[in-house]
Amino acid sequence: DNREARALWETQGIAVGQVGNKQPVVACLFPGQGSQYPGMLREIIAACPQASLLKEQMNQSLLKMGHPTFEDIIDNHEQTLGKDVFRTQLSMLLADTLVFKILQEMGLRADRLTGHSYGEFSALHAADAFQFENAVQATLFRCKSIEEAPIEGGLVSCAAGEDVVAAACASFPEDVFVANCNSPQQTVVGGEDRSLRRFVEFIQSEGIRTTTLDVPRPFHTPLMKPAQKPFKRALVSV
């Protein structure tokens, strides 16, 4: 029932609707790592038969490829979300894909598709550039390239604009980099864990609020460079 599904979407912060008579241009932005949480979409799957069917179809593909199922990943019994890179990124591919396909069944027709960070893999699948199995395989290659490279660190969100945060990074005596500019009042920085902890103290002393993101690497910073070449080589086979 679409009305029941729409009510559940709204509890998740997802709005579905149309304003006015003119058909709008519809853009879908797929979230990436850091948006995951245990039990994602549990209520929607329980209430929506189409969602349950899609989940089972994804499970069949995952099992054939030797990977854990949707439930194994999302229920997070092993406390791996946010720590295990592959399970965390795969959780976002599964959730992004399921939500997008259900919205399509509800009548959504997207004119533009894009992804935030890892969300580009979900966007590529939604655009049919990747089949589901290819998206999973590319995710695995991406994660192996990251995990096998000598990279440690994380990300911190700062409640300030890029100019302010970039200036703070420049005046800080250790390597901390601007990683994402999410909005005029939210900028994400990345670095090694020890440097990030000191940077948080430094920027908080300037009256700027911070949030440590649930990610295991300093994504979108120069520190990720060792993972680039191995990933590029692996993508050739996808």
Regions found by a protein language model. Name each.
Residues 15, 19-22, 68, 84, ...:
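Compositionally biased, intrinsically disordered low-complexity regions
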Residues 1-43, 79, 97-101, 105, ...:
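Short, low-complexity connector segments at domain boundaries
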Residues 25, 29-75, 90:
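Active-site machinery of serine-nucleophile hydrolases
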Residues 53-56, 65, 74-238:
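Acyltransferase
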